[in-house]
UniProtKB/Swiss-Prot annotation:
One of its GO terms (cellular component) is cytoplasm. Lens as well as other tissues. The modification N-acetylmethionine is found at residue 1. GO terms for biological process: negative regulation of apoptotic process; protein refolding; response to heat. Zn(2+) 2 binds at residues 103, 105. It holds the Pfam family HSP20. This is Alpha-crystallin B chain.
Amino acid sequence: MDITIHNPLIRRPLFSWLAPSRIFDQIFGEHLQESELLPASPSLSPFLMRSPIFRMPSWLETGLSEMRLEKDKFSVNLDVKHFSPEELKVKVLGDMVEIHGKHEERQDEHGFIAREFNRKYRIPADVDPLTITSSLSLDGVLTVSAPRKQSDVPERSIPITREEKPAIAGAQRK
């Protein structure tokens, strides 16, 4: 059974994409778009112009995290394209893998920026923490992965027996 855990934003209703509902939903660290600096067009509401749905292409390509639990492998993919390998640390703390990235203030095309993040992921019980590896792709995606231990217990059917007494005291059989 493969399990993919995506960014929680994807599971939000469509209407909630139209405007940030909380301060944490706002897009910090992103530059303003030209449309946000100009007066609103009468045909388009300023509410819609500032909505994340109009910013989706640039927004969805930065900072995404995906955890996958496949039949034979556990993996985490994290967009860290704004960090060099020297600015990243991956470590195991008990049953968690922690990824930390930090770079000091530096100038970019929009001014000065400093970034820092810290992510923790629970290591599945069937993964040996000593087998965890990490790699950074050319396009800035950090992959942390490990093989899953294969179960030695073979699959078997378990028969169902019928009891003559109710599971809940006082319940009557209908």
